[in-house]
C-alpha cells in the first residue's frame, strides 16, 4: 500500500467515485479528485454525458457507477497517492520510461514529482534518452548501410539490360570497389599515386627555382608529369562514364564532380594560352590562368574516393550543420564581446597594436580558437586579464559542440566500413565462379561406377549380402588396389 491511502477516511456525506484500474478497485472522494481538475480523473467528474465519459475512460458501468481503465494497476497506486498527498514519488525499482508514460496518460505534470525523487528521476531519464539516441543512431547507420547495399545490388542488375553489360559491369566494379580483386587494388593504387604525383608537381612548380620576373618557368619534366597526370585523370573519368549504368546518377555523385572539376583548370589554361590577342585583355587572361592553375589543388579531394575517413568526414559535416552553426554562433558572440572589451582598454596605449575593432576581431578569433599567432597581443594589465578570460571561454565554447560532431563522425565512419564490407561480401559469389568447381557427390559416383565396372570385368557378382565371406573381401580389396593402380598409371 502506498503512503497516503491508509490515513484517508471518507466522510459519510461525501460521494464516492468507484474506480477500476486493471482489476484494482478503489473508491475515492470527489473532493479529492477535484483538487486537480486538469488531470484525467478531475475532468471525468465534469462530464455530463456518457459519450464524454467514454472519451476519458475505457468503459463505464451505469449500474455500479464504476469507471474502468485498462492501465497498469501497480503504477496507478502512485497516481492515487498523488491525489491524496499532492506529490509524486518515484520508487527505485520503477522504469522511468513507463512511469513517464503513465503520468502523462493521467494528465499529471512532472513538476509534481517531489524533490526527494526529482533529481534521480531526471538523471535516469537523461540516461535513457542517451541510450535511445545511441541505439537510433546505430539503427539508422545500419539501415542506411543496408539501403546503400541494396542500391549497389540494383545498380548491378541494370547491367543485364545494357549493351555490353557484362563487360561494363566488370569495369565498373573494378573502378568503384578497390577491394573487389587484385586488378581493382592495382587501379586504386595507381590512381592514388597519380593524384599524389600531381600535387607534388604543383608544389614543386611554385618553388623559387622555377620562378622568374615574368612568371613561372615551364620545366619540361614537370610539364610532362602534369600532362601524364591529366591524361590519366581524363581517361579514368571517361572509363567511369562509359561503364556507368546510369549517366544521370553518375553526375549526381560528388566524387565524380570532383574528378571533373580537377581536370577543368588544365584544359581551360590550355585554351587561354593558345588564344592569340593583341589587346589589353592579355593581362587579364594571365590572371585567369594563374587562378585556374591554383584550382589544381582540388585534385587532393580525389583522395576521398580511396579514403573511408575523408568520406566519413564529408558525411559528418553534411549532417552536422546544426552543431557547426552553434559553434560558429558561440564563437561570433565571444569574438564580438571580447573584441570590444580589449579595444576599450588598449586604445589609449600607443604601444599596443590593437588600434581598431576589426583588428581586435582578428585577435579575438585566434585567441578563442587557442591559435595565438602572436602578431597582435595586449600590453596592458587589464588587456591581459581580458585575454586570459577570452582564452578560457574559447576552450569551453569550442569543446561543447566538438564532442557531438566527433560522435557523429564515429557513427558515419563505422557506417562507411559496413558498406565496404557489404559490397565485398556481395562480390564474393562472383569471384567464386572463377575458381575450380568440385562436386564430392559426382566424384563419389564416378569412383563407384569404376569400381562396379571392374568387378563386372572379372566376373564377380554380389547376390546376397549375407553370403559374403573373408575370402571374397580379400579379393575385393585386391581388385580395388589393382583398379586404383591402373587409374594412377592412366593419369
From Swiss-Prot:
Record's GO cellular component terms: cytosol; Golgi apparatus; membrane; plasma membrane; voltage-gated potassium channel complex
GO process annotations (BP): action potential; potassium ion transmembrane transport; potassium ion transport; protein homooligomerization; regulation of potassium ion transmembrane transport
Keyword Ion transport included in the entry's annotation: yes
Extracellular side: 205-220, 276-285, 344-357, 378-384
Localization of this protein: Cell membrane
Top-level taxon of the source organism: Eukaryota
Intramembrane spans: 358-369, 370-377
Cytoplasmic domain ranges by topology: 1-182, 244-254, 307-321, 414-491
Short motif Selectivity filter, span: 370-375
Tissue specificity remark: Detected in whole normal term placental and placental chorionic plate arteries and veins. Detected in syncytiotrophoblast and in blood vessel endothelium within intermediate villi and chorionic plate (at protein level). Detected in most tissues, but not in peripheral blood lymphocytes. The highest levels of expression are in lung.
Membrane topology field: Multi-pass membrane protein
Domain notes: The transmembrane segment S4 functions as a voltage-sensor and is characterized by a series of positively charged amino acids at every third position. Channel opening and closing is effected by a conformation change that affects the position and orientation of the voltage-sensor paddle formed by S3 and S4 within the membrane. A transmembrane electric field that is positive inside would push the positively charged S4 segment outwards, thereby opening the pore, while a field that is negative inside would pull the S4 segment inwards and close the pore.
Family membership noted in the UniProt record: Belongs to the potassium channel family. S (TC 1.A.1.2) subfamily. Kv9.3/KCNS3 sub-subfamily.
Job of this protein: Potassium channel regulatory subunit that modulates the delayed rectifier potassium channel activity of KCNB1 by namely slowing down the deactivation and inactivation time constants. While it does not form functional channel on its own, it can form functional heterotetrameric channels with KCNB1.
Protein name: Delayed-rectifier potassium channel regulatory subunit KCNS3
Organism, scientific name: Homo sapiens
Source species taxonomy: Eukaryota, Metazoa, Chordata, Craniata, Vertebrata
Amino acid at each position: 500500500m502506498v503512503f497516503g491511502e491508509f490515513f484517508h477516511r471518507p466522510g459519510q456525506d461525501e460521494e464516492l467515485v468507484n474506480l477500476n484500474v486493471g482489476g484494482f478497485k478503489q473508491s475515492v472522494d470527489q473532493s479529492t479528485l477535484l483538487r486537480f481538475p486538469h488531470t484525467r480523473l478531475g475532468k471525468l467528474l465534469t462530464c455530463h454525458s456518457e459519450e464524454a465519459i467514454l472519451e476519458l475512460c475505457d468503459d463505464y458501468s451505469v449500474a455500479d457507477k464504476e469507471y474502468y481503465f485498462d492501465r497498469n494497476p501497480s503504477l496507478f497506486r502512485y497516481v492515487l497517492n498523488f491525489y491524496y498527498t499532492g506529490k509524486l514519488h518515484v520508487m527505485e525499482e520503477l522504469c522511468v520510461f513507463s512511469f513517464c508514460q503513465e503520468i502523462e496518460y493521467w494528465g499529471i505534470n512532472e513538476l509534481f514529482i517531489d524533490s526527494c525523487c526529482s533529481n534521480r528521476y531526471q538523471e535516469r531519464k537523461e540516461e535513457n534518452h542517451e541510450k535511445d539516441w545511441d541505439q537510433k543512431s546505430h539503427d539508422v547507420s545500419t539501415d542506411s548501410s543496408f539501403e546503400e547495399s541494396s542500391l549497389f545490388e540494383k545498380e548491378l542488375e541494370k547491367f543485364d539490360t545494357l549493351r555490353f553489360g557484362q563487360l561494363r559491369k566488370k569495369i565498373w566494379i573494378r573502378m568503384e570497389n578497390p577491394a573487389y580483386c587484385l586488378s581493382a587494388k592495382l587501379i586504386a593504387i595507381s590512381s592514388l599515386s597519380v593524384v599524389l604525383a600531381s600535387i607534388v608537381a604543383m608544389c614543386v612548380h611554385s618553388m623559387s627555382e622555377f620562378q622568374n620576373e615574368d612568371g613561372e618557368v615551364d620545366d619540361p619534366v614537370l610539364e610532362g608529369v602534369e600532362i601524364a597526370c591529366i591524361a590519366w585523370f581524363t581517361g579514368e573519368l571517361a572509363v567511369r562514364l562509359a561503364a556507368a549504368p546510369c549517366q544521370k546518377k553518375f553526375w549526381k555523385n560528388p566524387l565524380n564532380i570532383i574528378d571533373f572539376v580537377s581536370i577543368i583548370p588544365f584544359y581551360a589554361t590550355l585554351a587561354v594560352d593558345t588564344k592569340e590577342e593583341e589587346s589589353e585583355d592579355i593581362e587579364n587572361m594571365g590572371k585567369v590562368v594563374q587562378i585556374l592553375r591554383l584550382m589544381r589543388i582540388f585534385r587532393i579531394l580525389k583522395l576521398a574516393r580511396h579514403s573511408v575517413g575523408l568520406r566519413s568526414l564529408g558525411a559528418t559535416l553534411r549532417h552536422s550543420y546544426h552543431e557547426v552553426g552553434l559553434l560558429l554562433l558561440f564563437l561570433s558572440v565571444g569574438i564580438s564581446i571580447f573584441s570590444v572589451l580589449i579595444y576599450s582598454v588598449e586604445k589609449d596605449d600607443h604601444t599596443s597594436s590593437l588600434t581598431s575593432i576589426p583588428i581586435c576581431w582578428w585577435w579575438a578569433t585566434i585567441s578563442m580558437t587557442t591559435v595565438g599567432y602572436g602578431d597582435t597581443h595586449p600590453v596592458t594589465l587589464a588587456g591581459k586579464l581580458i585575454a586570459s578570460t577570452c582564452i578560457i571561454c574559447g576552450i569551453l565554447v569550442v569543446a561543447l559542440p566538438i564532442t557531438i560532431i566527433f560522435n557523429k563522425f564515429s557513427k558515419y565512419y563505422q557506417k562507411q566500413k559496413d558498406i565496404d564490407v557489404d559490397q565485398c561480401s556481395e562480390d564474393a559469389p562472383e569471384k567464386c565462379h572463377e575458381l575450380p568447381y568440385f562436386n564430392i557427390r559426382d566424384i563419389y559416383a564416378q569412383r563407384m561406377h569404376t569400381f562396379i565396372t571392374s568387378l563386372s570385368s572379372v566376373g564377380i557378382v554380389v547376390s546376397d549380402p549375407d553370403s559374403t565371406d573373408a575370402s571374397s573381401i580379400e579379393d575385393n580389396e585386391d581388385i580395388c588396389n589393382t583398379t586404383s593402380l591402373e587409374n594412377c598409371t592412366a593419369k
